[in-house]
C-alpha cells in the first residue's frame, strides 16, 4: 500500500488530478490518497476516472483552515501557499498514527513507471534510519550552493529537493516537527528563496535520507532529450511547465499531456499567465516547426484558441 499526500489549491486542480492519475495508472500497489486543499473538502471535484480507479483504496480530502502568520515568497510566483500545507499534514490526516510513512508528491510530477518497490524499500530504510525525511539531493552549481549555505546559515552542503518526500510519521510526531519547522520558518522568513523547501533544509541541515534520482528526475523543458528508461517519476522542475504554451512545444511535455488526455479532461491542458506571451510562444512554435512534436496538432490549435477566452491562470 502507498500512502500519498498532495497539497494544492483550485488553480492547480488539473495538474494535481493528472499527477494523481499517473500514480494510479502505474502503481502495482493500492493507494491511500490524502489531499490538503485550500478551497474545499468535497470529493466531487475529482474526475470519475480517479474516484472509480481500481488502484484507489481510499481518498480523504481536507480543507486547510490553519491560521498562520505568513507564507513567504508566494506572491507573483508559480508556487502557491499550498506548498506550505505539508508542514501541517499530521494535523489533518485521520488515523495518522496508523501510518508508518507518508509520501508527499508535488503536483508537477508524473509517474512514468511503477514506483511502488522503490518507494516501499526506501520507506523501510528511512524508518530504520535516524532520519525523519527522505528526499533527493539537490544539485546546484558551486556558486549557487555557496549562496544558499550563507543565506540559510547551513553547516552542510547537502541540500534536498522537496518535490517528493518520504516522511517517517512516528519520528515527525514524536519530534514535534510541525512546531519546530514553523518556528524555523519565522526565523528565516526574510531569507527564504525556495519556499518551504528552504525551511526543511534550514532545520535539517543535511540530515536526511537520500533518495535515488529515479524517484524525482528533473525534466528540463529547455531541451528535447528523452528521459531514461530507469526513471520512475519525472519532475517538471522550475517555472517552465508542460501546460504552458512554451512548455507544450517540448517533446517531454507529452508525459503530462498524454496522462491528462487519458484522464478524460480534454485533449490539451493549456494555461496562460500572460496571453500576449502565450500568443508569441504559439507563433514561434509554429514557425520553428516545433508543432510537429505534438500528437494532436489540430486539437492543440483549437484548444489553444479556446483557452485564450478563459480566465488567466496564476501559474
Which residues are covered by each model-predicted region?
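N-proximal low-complexity "stem/linker" segments adjacent to membrane-targeting elements
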Residues: 1-21
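A glycosyltransferase accessory/donor-loop signature
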Residues: 1-2, 8, 167-315
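Catalytic metal- and UDP-sugar-binding loop of GT-A-like glycosyltransferases, i.e.
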Residues: 105
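Short, acidic, metal-binding catalytic loop of nucleotide-sugar glycosyltransferases
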Residues: 22-30
Amino acid at each position: 500500500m502507498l500512502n500519498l499526500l498532495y497539497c494544492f489549491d483550485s488553480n492547480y486542480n488539473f495538474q494535481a488530478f493528472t499527477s494523481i492519475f499517473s500514480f494510479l495508472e502505474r502503481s502495482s500497489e493500492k493507494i491511500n490518497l490524502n489531499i490538503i486543499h485550500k478551497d474545499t473538502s468535497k470529493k466531487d471535484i475529482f474526475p470519475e476516472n480517479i474516484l472509480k480507479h481500481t488502484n484507489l483504496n481510499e481518498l480523504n480530502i481536507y480543507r486547510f483552515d490553519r491560521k498562520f502568520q505568513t507564507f513567504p515568497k508566494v506572491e507573483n510566483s508559480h508556487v502557491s501557499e499550498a506548498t506550505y500545507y505539508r508542514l501541517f499534514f499530521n494535523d489533518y490526516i485521520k488515523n495518522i498514527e496508523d501510518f508508518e510513512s507518508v509520501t508527499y508528491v508535488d503536483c508537477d510530477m508524473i509517474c512514468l513507471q511503477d514506483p511502488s518497490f522503490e518507494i516501499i524499500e526506501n520507506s523501510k530504510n528511512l524508518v530504520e534510519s535516524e532520519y525523519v525525511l527522505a528526499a533527493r539531493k539537490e544539485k546546484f552549481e558551486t556558486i549557487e550552493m555557496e549562496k544558499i549555505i550563507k543565506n540559510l546559515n547551513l553547516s552542510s552542503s547537502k541540500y534536498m529537493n522537496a518535490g517528493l518526500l518520504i516522511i517517517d510519521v512516528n519520528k515527525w510526531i514524536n519530534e514535534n516537527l510541525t512546531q519546530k519547522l514553523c518556528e524555523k520558518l519565522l526565523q528565516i522568513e526574510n531569507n527564504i528563496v525556495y519556499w518551504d523547501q528552504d525551511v526543511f533544509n534550514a532545520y535539517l541541515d543535511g540530515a536526511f535520507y537520500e533518495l535515488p534520482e529515479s524517484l524525482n528526475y528533473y525534466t528540463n523543458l529547455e531541451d528535447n532529450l528523452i528521459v531514461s528508461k530507469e526513471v520512475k517519476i519525472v519532475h517538471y522542475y522550475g517555472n517552465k511547465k508542460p501546460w504552458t504554451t512554451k512548455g507544450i512545444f517540448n517533446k517531454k511535455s507529452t508525459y503530462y499531456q498524454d496522462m491528462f488526455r487519458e484522464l478524460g479532461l480534454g485533449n490539451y491542458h493549456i494555461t496562460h499567465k500572460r496571453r500576449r506571451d502565450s500568443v508569441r510562444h504559439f507563433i514561434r512554435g509554429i514557425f520553428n516547426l516545433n508543432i510537429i512534436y505534438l500528437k494532436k496538432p489540430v486539437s492543440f490549435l483549437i484548444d489553444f484558441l479556446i483557452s485564450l477566452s478563459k480566465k488567466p491562470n496564476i501559474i
